[in-house]
């Protein structure tokens, strides 16, 4: 058993790549170690293309084992179940990083599995998994010539931090992951605290500069440990077939792409496709028999060439816009009467209905990970039903990877402006229902989420808007597109989503389909996105630019009280009897903590006020010189103890009672008296006198 090893440094941390010791029946197998973190990444490549496959079936699975952190899973079965949303997001991150490096037309199935075997809690294993995926591919024999690497970058006090640990990220204004090849950037994923575009661009370039060290190490490992290159074929469009279709139908296709409406355009194109199939099947084009798949692939290639060439030649886009024009926007808030907050955001043929719901601490999501159980106060969910694109399909199923990814992007975009628990004790759930989609539904979700939360009275620091940028590139010629359509995303070379406030960027997500882009293109895309974002924010601000001061009449009420910690036991009562009584009488939900914090959550203001008043009565402190009504709770030889505020007793001597003209032999327990607080000594003992009748 021969083991090969490569060692390099990343941000003053030693990273070790090793192959030959584990999972040797996989085509590629690499362990990546940093400190006590160990990730095993395997690659298996099918040696032939499955019948009927007309796409690249790459699948990436990132898995965390609880034993890696010395823990036993929860649940009845006590074993790992389906991947968490975080694991799915990391799987997508790896997939998006490596997919552009494969040749067009390569359709062999590839499966990559990254398994976290050991975890020290200091660093997230996601970057190790990404590096391991690239290394295992490089030695697997797959056609993977442009080796990819990825790094994370933070930004604190005006300085970039390479490979930050989790504590660094907590103090950082930026969490940026960049992947790419030696000479090109392929993928960007980030969350930021409204940073300027210049800082974001600087972070991307800083990250790319440090990829070379990782790539060189992977190449050295591949040089000594790589398997022979597999034999594979590349699917190619039949050029003669394409020319025949173009000669007969190009004029019709060209006219179809002048129709701005997506539905009308698709109806026209479907009719042309039907005619193309009939023409090819009924005529002896060149003596060959073509399949429907081959014909439609050639037709699609003509569409792609047409749309791209029109844009590069400066002609109007599919819907008649120029490269920088944003589609018409319509904004409405408060569109649903029975919810806590709502917004309907429409941009062209993309529409998001976004609803905000307020809840208490008990509604917070508990997220289990290798770090333990974390309470999540802000949830954002994204739903993409089939009717949004005029199709039939499965409804009510678990969210797909794409839906999870879009929800995460929108949440990261708005996380920077979301209030902390001290400022806003509510738990918030935002749901985006995509009602129509023709490009950029995730950015519509960002805009709608900001509007919906402001409508619900959530005190977000600033409104947030998002825009999706595209790219058409052919050699040295290129065009950056603002607010891309679905077809422009599908037929273009880049999907670059930018979200932020008027002050700066809060989230970036970039995916490239070509072999990377230059600094010049990045700068133009960021600047064009900034102009588009400010335009969208201006329209949103005309409807609502600050959160509503009060929550909706149908929203629950929440009140936070900070009382003397010693009084918590009085609020709770013996065996919880007191707090249960308040809950039963008012219908409110009450949470207490040993620090003295009491949270009261009620369905309406009346229940809230009643519960707060009852708690205030229990925890109220008596004051010298004040008169109180109390009840005798204990008789002594020299006087009586009188309960004043439910939780505090005072001593009333018989001499004071007699001085007020009352006979002491008539006193009984439970009898009501009106008393004056004469004195409270250092020990908290209260001396009373009787108020004369």
Curated annotation (Swiss-Prot):
Residues 625-693 form the S1 motif domain. This is Polyribonucleotide nucleotidyltransferase. Keywords: Cytoplasm, Magnesium, Metal-binding, Nucleotidyltransferase, RNA-binding, Transferase. It comes from Francisella tularensis subsp. tularensis (strain SCHU S4 / Schu 4). Its EC number is 2.7.7.8. It is found in: Cytoplasm. Belongs to the polyribonucleotide nucleotidyltransferase family. The keyword Ribonucleoprotein does not apply. It catalyses: RNA(n+1) + phosphate = RNA(n) + a ribonucleoside 5'-diphosphate. One of its GO terms (molecular function) is RNA binding. The gene is pnp. Residues 556-615 form the KH domain.
């Amino acid at each position: 058993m021969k083991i090969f090893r490569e060692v390099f440094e990343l941000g003053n941390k030693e990273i070790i790549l090793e192959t030959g010791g584990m999972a040797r029946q996989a085509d590629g197998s690499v362990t990546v170690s940093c400190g006590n973190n160990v990730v095993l990444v395997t690659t298996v490549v099918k040696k032939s293309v499955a019948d009927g496959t007309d796409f690249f079936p790459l699948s990436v699975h990132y898995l965390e084992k609880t034993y890696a952190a010395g823990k036993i899973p929860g649940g009845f079965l006590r074993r790992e179940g389906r991947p968490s949303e975080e694991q799915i997001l990391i799987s997508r991150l790896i997939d998006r990083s490596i997919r552009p490096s494969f040749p067009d037309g390569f359709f062999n199935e590839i499966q990559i599995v990254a398994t976290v075997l050991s975890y020290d809690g200091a660093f997230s294993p996601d970057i190790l998994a990404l590096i391991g995926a690239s290394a295992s591919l490089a030695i697997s024999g797959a056609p993977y010539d442009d080796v990819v690497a990825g790094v994370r970058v933070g930004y604190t006090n005006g300085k970039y931090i390479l490979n930050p640990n989790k504590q660094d990220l907590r103090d950082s204004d930026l969490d940026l992951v960049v992947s790419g090849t030696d000479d090109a950037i392929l993928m960007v994923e980030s969350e930021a605290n409204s940073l300027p575009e210049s800082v974001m661009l600087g972070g991307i370039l800083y990250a790319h500069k440090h990829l070379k060290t990782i790539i060189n190490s992977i190449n050295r490992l591949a040089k000594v440990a790589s398997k022979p290159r597999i034999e594979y074929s590349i699917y190619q469009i039949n050029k003669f077939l394409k020319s025949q279709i173009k000669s007969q139908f190009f004029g019709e296709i060209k006219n179809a792409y002048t129709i701005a409406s997506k539905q009308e355009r698709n109806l026209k194109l479907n009719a042309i496709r039907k005619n193309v199939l009939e023409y090819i099947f009924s005529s002896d084009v060149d003596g060959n028999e073509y399949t429907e798949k081959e014909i439609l692939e050639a037709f699609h290639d003509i569409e792609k060439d047409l749309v791209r060439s029109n844009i590069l030649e400066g002609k109007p886009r599919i819907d008649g816009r120029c490269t920088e024009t944003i589609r018409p926007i319509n904004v409405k808030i408060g569109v649903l009467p029975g919810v806590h907050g709502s917004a309907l955001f429409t941009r062209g043929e993309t529409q998001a209905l976004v609803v905000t719901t307020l809840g208490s601490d008990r509604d917070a999501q508990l997220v289990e990970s290798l770090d333990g159980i974390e309470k999540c106060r802000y949830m954002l969910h994204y739903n993409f039903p089939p009717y949004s694109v005029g199709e039939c399909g499965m409804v009510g199923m678990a969210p797909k990877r794409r839906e999870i990814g879009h929800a995460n992007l929108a949440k990261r975009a708005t996380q920077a402006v979301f209030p902390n628990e001290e400022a806003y004790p509510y738990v918030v759930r935002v749901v985006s229902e995509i009602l129509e989609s023709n490009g950029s539904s995730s950015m519509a979700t960002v805009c709608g989420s900001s509007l919906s939360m402001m409508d619900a009275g959530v005190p977000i620091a600033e409104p947030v808007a998002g825009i999706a940028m595209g790219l058409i590139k052919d050699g040295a010629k290129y065009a950056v597109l603002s607010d891309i359509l679905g077809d422009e995303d599908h037929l273009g070379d880049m999907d670059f989503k930018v979200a932020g406030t008027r002050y700066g960027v809060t989230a970036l997500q970039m995916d490239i389909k070509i072999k990377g882009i230059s600094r010049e293109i990045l700068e133009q895309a960021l600047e064009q996105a900034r102009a588009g974002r400010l335009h969208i924010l201006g329209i949103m601000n005309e409807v609502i630019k600050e959160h509503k001061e009060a929550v909706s009449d149908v929203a629950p009420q929440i009140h936070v009280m900070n009382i003397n910690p010693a009084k918590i036991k009085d609020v709770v009562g013996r065996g919880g009897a007191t707090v249960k009584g308040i809950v039963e009488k008012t219908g409110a939900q009450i949470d207490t903590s040993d620090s003295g914090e009491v949270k009261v959550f009620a369905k309406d203001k009346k229940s809230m006020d009643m519960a707060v008043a009852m708690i205030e009565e229990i925890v109220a402190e008596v004051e010298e010189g004040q008169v109180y009504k109390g009840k005798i709770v204990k008789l002594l030889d020299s006087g009586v103890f009188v309960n004043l505020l439910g939780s505090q007793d005072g001593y009333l001597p018989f001499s004071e009672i007699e001085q007020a003209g009352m006979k002491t032999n008539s006193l009984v327990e439970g009898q009501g008296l009106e008393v004056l607080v004469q004195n409270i000594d250092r020990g908290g003992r209260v001396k009373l006198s009787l108020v004369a009748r």
